[in-house]
Regions:
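Core dinuclear metal-dependent hydrolase active-site scaffold
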Residues: 1-26, 42, 107-112
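Conserved short-loop catalytic and cofactor-binding motifs
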Residues: 20, 35, 75
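Amphipathic, non-transmembrane alpha-helical secondary structure
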Residues: 21, 47-48
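Active-site-proximal segments of metal-dependent phosphoesterases and phosphodiesterases across multiple
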Residues: 27, 31-46
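Short, conserved loop/helix-junction motifs that constitute active-site signature segments
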Residues: 25-28, 50-56
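Active-site neighborhood of phospho(di)ester-bond hydrolases with catalytic His/Asp-centered motifs
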Residues: 12-17, 32-37, 60-65, 102-105
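Binuclear metal-ion centers of metallo-dependent hydrolases, dominated by the metallo-beta-lactamase
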Residues: 53-112
Length: 112
């Protein structure tokens, strides 16, 4: 886990392993890089706990969802259907003001 602060913004990057809420309280990042690897599914309410303790960040970018050890041209559709879409939909339920941004490899995007 890392917290990067620059100007008046902050980015919190999380893996997909457990955490202790009191260690994250008050961080309130503008951007949360949320690890959504399958290992988090065995942890009690991981997604909900993470989003809530970080103050329902305005922007959430899922990471660790792809099969990263295959060529870039390899289809990630199974991971999109099995990991990204369920995560995006769940975040929409628990934090409707948060925007889930799904990056595309080697494509730039701007966060306002």
């Amino acid at each position: 886990m890392f917290l990067a602060r620059f100007d008046s913004h902050s980015v919190l990057t999380m893996g997909s392993m457990n955490f202790i809420e009191r260690e994250l309280e008050g961080l309130d990042p503008d951007i949360l890089l949320a690890g959504i690897n399958g290992s988090r599914l065995g942890l009690y309410n991981y997604d909900e706990r993470l989003v809530n303790v970080t103050g329902n960040p305005p922007v959430i970018i899922p990471t660790h969802w792809d099969t990263f050890n295959l060529p870039y041209g390899f289809s990630q559709e199974a991971n999109v259907e099995g990991k990204l879409i369920p995560f995006r939909d769940f975040v929409a339920e628990i934090s409707p003001e948060s925007r889930v941004v799904v990056p595309v490899h080697l494509e730039q995007f701007a966060i306002e």
